[in-house]
């Protein structure tokens, strides 16, 4: 698994959580496989790509106001403060370069380019991180190390 010195932090393994993992944890009844998998990971290794924060906040922002939105917002806020605790892997120059190279390669191959997943891949590549996602096929051609916590 990936080890990293420097940003996003120290010399340790870095695990980035994709949007679908966070969404599964925000539900009334979080996916038990994801919870069990996450419980086996050192919390200090859990990071969130800044793009995932965007996706989650945007998704909540376009929801109709009501109790479901409030509950999901509270769930996200709890996860951000308790699980992630400020460990946000940002889109910096290196990760933007890696994402741009990947997007150009995909376009040249005629492969559809999903900008958000490409930015997440760039962050993962620049961080030499393991990406926890249900959508492994979105990242396989990028050379990103992935794990599917829904299957563990």
Task: For each feature predicted by the language model, list its residue ranges.
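Residues at the C-termini of beta-strands that transition into short coil/loop
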Residues: 50-52, 92, 135, 150
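Short, well-structured N-terminal submotif of metal-dependent ribonuclease cores
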Residues: 1-52, 61-78, 137, 141
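Flexible glycine-rich beta->alpha loop in the catalytic core of nucleotide-sugar glycosyltransferases
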Residues: 130, 137, 152
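Short, hinge-like loop/turn segments at secondary-structure boundaries
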Residues: 64-69, 106-107, 148-152
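Structural detector of well-ordered beta-strand residues that form the stable sheet scaffold
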Residues: 47-49, 89, 132, 147
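Acidic-residue sensor for enzyme active/binding pockets
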Residues: 55
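Active-site neighborhoods of divalent-metal-dependent phosphate/nucleic-acid chemistry enzymes
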Residues: 2-13, 58-64, 82-130, 134
């Amino acid at each position: 698994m990936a080890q990293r010195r420097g940003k996003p932090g120290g010399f340790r393994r870095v695990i980035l959580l994709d949007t679908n993992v966070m969404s599964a944890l925000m539900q009334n009844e979080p996916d038990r496989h994801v919870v069990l998998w996450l419980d086996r990971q050192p919390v200090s290794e859990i990071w969130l790509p800044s793009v995932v924060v965007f996706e989650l906040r945007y998704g909540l922002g376009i929801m109709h106001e009501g109790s479901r939105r409030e509950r999901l917002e509270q769930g996200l806020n709890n996860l951000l403060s308790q699980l992630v605790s400020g460990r946000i892997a940002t889109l910096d120059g290196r990760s933007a370069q890696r994402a741009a190279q990947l997007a150009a390669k995909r376009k040249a191959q005629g492969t559809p380019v999903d900008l958000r997943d490409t930015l997440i891949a760039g962050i993962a590549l620049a961080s030499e991180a393991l990406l926890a996602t249900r959508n492994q096929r979105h990242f396989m051609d990028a050379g990103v190390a992935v794990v599917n916590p829904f299957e563990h």
